[in-house]
């Protein structure tokens, strides 16, 4: 897969909407932070150090492809890309907002199905990420562990017998693992239970963030729930703990949905129908309004209020309607009004398909 194909399509494997509990869990993610033992952390690297890191990453990717993953991995140096294209990767959750800036010595390796991505020279030397559809933390971990093992065949990671893997941020020291689930929780928000739930999650050592992770706000009632520290626990324990909590959150959201629909059936049907009506007829729409209305429609699909729409379409729209993706499809820079017009046209077309 070439770079142009990568940034021209809004589809990724995690958007398929076929995983367990896809009505609530958009995706599961496993991220591993790794650093080479013979280089300083990224914040202290010299220019020769960064070139050595990029060359090491290229060698590591070659090793990954020798393992025989179903989807080939390609490495791209970000200095050779445009800001617009890098923003598309942010919108597709393949790189972080931080990785898209100051790119002279940075790279990213991405598999053809976009399930695997490896950020090079972000906060750590390597950030291995695996995304899976629905609640599939164990499957994402299986793939991430295989990628990690393949890299260790070629690279020597910084590791301490007592502390574990050494990372730039102390909260990642240990396993270097961050497990997360992206969840749609409209009923908990509408019944005003979300605040209490998030407080309880923080007491359990979890953190709740917005759609694009740290420093971002929740949009479309979509939240990212992840572990906060990785020291002193095995990878399997961290993942099992998050999965158990995710299942509890799913049960709580489902109960809230049943309560809402049982007590306020007419109001919910009106809210969902209005959202569907606007999205299928509007001639211009902002990203904020679209996110809010798509959240209502997604809830309506789960409750059977609106015609059955594939979750894949709803997931892909979350990305395809973002500013960078819209401009890439247009082949030119768009002003805000032009983006709103193209966004509305895109949503009308996809929902009526």
Swiss-Prot record:
Residues 24-256 form the Phosphagen kinase C-terminal domain. GO terms for biological process: phosphocreatine biosynthetic process. ATP binds at residues 27-31, 93, 127, 178-182, 209-214. A motif (RDXXRA motif of the pArg binding pocket involved in allosteric regulation) lies at residues 339-344. It is an enzyme of class 2 (transferase). It comes from the Bacteria. One of its GO terms (cellular component) is extracellular space. The keyword Nucleotide-binding applies. GO terms for molecular function: ATP binding; creatine kinase activity; protein kinase activity. Its EC number is 2.7.14.1. Appears to be allosterically activated by the binding of pArg-containing polypeptides to the pArg-binding pocket localized in the C-terminal domain of McsB. Disulfide bonds: none annotated. Keywords: Allosteric enzyme, ATP-binding, Kinase, Nucleotide-binding, Transferase. It catalyses: L-arginyl-[protein] + ATP = N(omega)-phospho-L-arginyl-[protein] + ADP + H(+). PANTHER family: ARGININE KINASE 1-RELATED (PTHR11547:SF38), ARGININE OR CREATINE KINASE (PTHR11547). Belongs to the ATP:guanido phosphotransferase family. Catalyzes the specific phosphorylation of arginine residues in proteins. HAMAP family: Prot_Arg_kinase. This is Protein-arginine kinase. The gene is mcsB.
């Amino acid at each position: 897969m070439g770079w142009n194909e990568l940034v021209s399509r809004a589809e990724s494997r995690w958007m398929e909407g076929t995983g367990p509990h896809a009505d609530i869990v958009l995706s599961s993610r496993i991220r591993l932070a790794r650093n080479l033992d013979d280089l300083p952390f990224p914040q202290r690297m010299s220019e020769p150090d960064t070139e050595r890191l990029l060359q090491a990453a290229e060698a590591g990717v070659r090793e990954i492809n020798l393992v025989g993953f179903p989807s080939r991995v390609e490495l791209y140096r970000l200095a050779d890309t445009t800001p617009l294209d890098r923003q598309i990767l942010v919108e597709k959750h393949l790189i972080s907002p931080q990785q898209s800036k100051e790119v002279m010595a940075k790279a990213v390796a991405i598999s053809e199905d976009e399930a695997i991505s490896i950020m090079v020279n972000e906060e750590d030397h390597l950030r291995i990420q695996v995304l899976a559809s629905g609640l599939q933390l164990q499957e994402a971990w299986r793939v991430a562990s295989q990628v990690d093992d393949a890299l260790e065949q070629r690279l020597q990671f910084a590791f301490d017998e007592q502390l574990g893997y050494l990372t730039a941020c102390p909260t990642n020291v240990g396993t270097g693992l961050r497990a997360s689930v992206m969840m749609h929780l409209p009923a908990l928000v509408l019944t005003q239970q979300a605040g209490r739930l998030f407080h309880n999650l923080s007491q359990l050592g979890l953190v709740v963030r917005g759609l694009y992770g740290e420093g971002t706000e929740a949009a479309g009632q979509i939240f990212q729930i992840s572990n906060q520290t990785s020291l002193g626990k095995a990878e399997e324990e961290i993942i099992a703990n998050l999965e158990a909590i995710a299942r509890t959150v799913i049960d709580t959201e489902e109960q809230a949905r049943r309560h809402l629909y049982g007590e306020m059936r007419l109001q919910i049907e009106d809210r969902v129908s209005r959202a569907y009506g606007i999205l299928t007829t509007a001639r211009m729409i902002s990203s904020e309004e679209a996110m809010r209305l798509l959240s209502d429609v997604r809830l309506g699909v789960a409750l059977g209020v609106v015609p059955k729409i594939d979750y894949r379409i709803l997931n892909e729209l979350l990305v395809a309607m973002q500013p960078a993706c819209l401009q890439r499809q247009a082949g030119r820079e768009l002003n805000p009004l032009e983006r709103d017009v193209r966004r509305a046209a895109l949503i009308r077309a996809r929902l009526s398909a």
